[in-house]
Amino acid sequence: MQGDDGAAIIFFFMFLFMAFAAGVQLRYFFAVFAAIILMIPILWNYVFAEYQKQRIINQINPEADPLNTGFQQIQGKISIGSGKIFGQGLFNGPRVGSNSVPIQESDFIFSVAGEELGFIGCTLIILLLCLMLFRTLKTASMSSDCLGTYICFGFFGLVASQTIFNLGMCLSVLPVMGVTLPFFSAGGSSSACLYLGIGLIQSVYIQRDDDDINAIISE
C-alpha cells in the first residue's frame, strides 16, 4: 500500500503560502527549508519507504529500468516530444490511442496534450493556469479582510504546486508522485476541491464588491 505523497506535499506548500500571507518572516521559511535539507540523510535511511526511494532513483535515471519502474516517465516524455509544434490532432495521437502512455487520463494528461496539441497547446494550457493564478493573487490584494487573503493564497498554493509537480512528473524533472493537473486531469475529489476553491475565491471577490458599495453609501 502506497501513501498519497503528492497530496501531503501540496498541503505543505499551501500552508507555506498561507503563512506568508499571514506575515511570517522569510527567515523562518529559510530555516524550515534548511532543516529539511539537513534531514535528508535521516529521511532517506529511516523514514522513506522503499517505493519512495525507488521513485527518486527512477527520476534521476529512468532508463535504468525502462520496462518497469522507469516506464511511466519515459513514455510520458516520448509522447510530449512526438507532438512537436502543432501536435497530432485532438484524439488522433497514436501513442495515446494505443494506451502507451500510462495513467493518461489523470497523472499524465499533460503528455497527452503534448502529443495531440503540440507545443502550442501545452503553452496555452500553462498560460491559462498562470492567468488563473494571477487573478487569484489580484483578488487577494483586493480582499476586505485577512480571511479572504488567506483563502486566496491557499488556493494559489494548491493550484501552483499541483501544476509544477504535474509538469515536473511528465517532463521527468520530478519523481512520479500521483499529482493531477488542475482542471484538466480526470478525478472526482480533485476536481471537486478545485471548483470549491473557485467558489471561495468568487465569494472573496463578491465580498469586496459589497464592502465598496457600503463605503459609497456611508459617504
What is each residue range found by the language model?
Residues 1, 5-45:
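Hydrophobic alpha-helical segments of polytopic membrane proteins
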Residues 9-17, 33-39, 120-131, 153, ...:
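Lipid-exposed faces of alpha-helical membrane segments in multi-pass integral membrane proteins
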Residues 123-126, 135-148, 212-219:
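Membrane-proximal intracellular helices of multi-pass ion channels
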Residues 138-178, 184:
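Loop-to-helix entry and N-terminal half of a specific, functionally important transmembrane alpha helix
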Residues 166-219:
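A juxtamembrane structural motif centered on a specific transmembrane helix
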